[in-house]
Amino acid sequence: MTLFSSISSMSTSMSGSKSSIASFGSGTSMSSNSIACGGGCGGSGGILGSGLGLGLGLGLDLTGGSRSRGSCGGNRGNGNGNGGMGGGNGSCCGGPCCGI
């Protein structure tokens, strides 16, 4: 949690594409929830972050049922807040995993 929080806070000072990569990288070392969250949260305001969040959400829905978390993360990264294609009520949407 400490590592992920530091990456998330650091990503805000980086460019959109770099922050999404950094956050995604830290997310892969944790649970599937963190992976889905990392995609959208890392993009903070960037189109790339939104794409990663949506893509991860769709992919994880086939194996871990995390589509709502991934979609929410992508929309948050794109500046649209909660409420993605999966409902936007996953534990990562407004939880501590994104440092929000």
Swiss-Prot record:
Residues 1-29, 67-100 are annotated as: Disordered. InterPro entries: HssA/B-like_chaperone (IPR050533), HssA/B-related (IPR008455). It comes from the Eukaryota. Residues 71-93 have a biased composition (Gly residues). One of its GO terms (biological process) is sorocarp development. Belongs to the hssA/B family. This is HssA/B-like protein 37. It comes from Dictyostelium discoideum. The gene is hssl37.
